[in-house]
Amino acid sequence: MVNAELFSKSPHSKIFIQMGVPGCAVCHSNHAIFETSDAMLSAGDKSACAACHAPTSAGGALAASMLGSIVRLKSGYEKALAVLKNAEHAGMEVSQPLFELNEAKTALIKARAAIHGFDQAILDKEVEPGLKVSDKAYARGVKTLDELQYRRKGLAISALIILALVVGLILKIRQMERKAK
C-alpha cells in the first residue's frame, strides 16, 4: 500500500481531520519538510510521536514497539551484509546470498512505509519476511566463512605435507650422491 492509503485507514487520520490539520504536515511539517529517519519514532529530540504522545502512553508504547521492529530488521540486514562482505573480501563466492539479501533491504523500505498505518500487525507483515531473509543470509555467510577456514587449514596441511616430501627428496638425493662417491 501507498503511505497515503495506510494513513487514511489509521486512527490518526480521523483525529487529524477533526483537528483540521493535514495528516502529513503533523509529522513531516508543512513547508520545511523534515528529513525522515527512524528517530522520528523514538522518544528523543527528532521524535514526531513525542509531540502528542508521552513515552508511557499507548501511542508512545506503539511508537517504541514499531521502532524496535525497524531496528531489529535494520540490524539483521546490516549484520548479514557485514558477514557476507567479509566472505566476499576473502575471495569466497557469495553473490547469490548477497542478491537474496536485497529482499531484506526491500522489506526494510516497505516496513518504513508501513509505519504510516500506525499498526504493529501491518508493520510485522513487512518486517518478518525481511528478518527471515536476513537470518538466512547471515547463516550462509557464517557457513561460507567456516568453509574458508576449512580451506585454509587444508591448504596449510597440504603445504606441510608437500614441504616434508620436498625435504625428504632432498635428503634422499644427498644420501644417494654420497653413496655414489
Indicate residue ranges for each PLM-predicted region.
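Long, amphipathic, charge-rich alpha-helical segments that form helical bundles/coiled-coils
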Residues: 98-112, 154
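Juxtamembrane amphipathic/hinge helix adjacent to a transmembrane helix
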Residues: 106, 114-148
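Alpha-helix boundary/capping detector
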Residues: 78, 130, 156, 160-163, ...
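Juxtamembrane interface at the cytosolic side of transmembrane helices
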Residues: 163-181
